[in-house]
Curated annotation (Swiss-Prot):
Names of required cofactors: Mg(2+); Mn(2+)
Protein name: Inosine triphosphate pyrophosphatase
Catalytic activity, as annotated: ITP + H2O = IMP + diphosphate + H(+); dITP + H2O = dIMP + diphosphate + H(+); XTP + H2O = XMP + diphosphate + H(+)
HAMAP family membership: HAM1_NTPase
The UniProt record lists the keyword Metal-binding: yes
Chief site of localization: cytoplasm
PANTHER family: INOSINE TRIPHOSPHATE PYROPHOSPHATASE, INOSINE TRIPHOSPHATE PYROPHOSPHATASE/HAM1 PROTEIN
Length: 199
């Protein structure tokens, strides 16, 4: 599928995340994807509300179409914590600390959730796309250069995200599922979006 000249800014300064998103979207994504690092405030609240507000703020900064992503890692024994605050928890405690949070609990189950939010520009409607993968928290295994991937083992697999072949991971991951929903929306609304993004 040929790409239109319209570009969507994916707000991230994380090169690995950008690479993974580009791999998942593939050549069939109808719009050019650029990226930009914007220092958005660390918001508190429910994950979908955080994504919407980040998208609104990013669109105002970029003055055009944007995509933002918010990722949560939710421990069932802790009623969903760390949730959207996982980046802060990981920075402060490391992989061992994440495991230690569950040391007193027999339930190590967790789910990874990704919410992409998209808007065509400032003041326009914001669409959200939620992807979720169930799994469990395990001692870190595999490369440690991509967030909490080494401690999350998805249900039905013996490997952590960090140990998995990237193609397999992208096909079952929370991010892959969220982007699949986003792509379905873009396919359904392609003509309408092309007009809005060309304006």
């Amino acid at each position: 599928m040929a790409k239109t000249t319209a570009a969507i800014t994916f707000v991230t300064g994380n090169a690995k995340k950008l690479q993974e998103v580009q791999q998942i979207l593939g050549q069939g994504f109808p719009f050019e994807l650029t990226n930009r690092k914007i220092d958005l405030p660390e918001l508190q609240g429910e994950p979908e509300d955080i994504s919407r507000e980040k998208c609104r703020l990013a669109a105002a900064e970029v003055k055009g179409p944007v995509m933002v992503e918010d990722t949560s890692l939710c421990f069932n024994a802790l009623h969903g914590l760390p949730g959207p605050y996982i980046k802060w928890f990981l920075d402060k405690t490391g992989h061992v600390g994440l495991n230690n949070l569950l040391a007193a609990y027999p339930d190590k189950s967790a789910y990874a959730q990704c919410i992409f939010a998209f808007t065509t520009g400032p003041g326009a409607e914001i669409q959200t796309f939620v992807g979720r993968t169930e799994g469990k928290i395990v001692p870190a295994r595999g490369p440690t250069d991509f967030g909490w991937d080494p401690v999350f083992q998805p249900d039905g697999f013996e490997e952590t995200y960090a140990e998995m072949d990237k193609t397999i991971k992208n096909s079952i991951s929370h991010r892959g599922r969220s982007l699949s929903a986003l792509c379905a929306y873009f396919d359904t609304h392609k003509a309408e979006l092309e007009k809005q993004l060309a304006a």
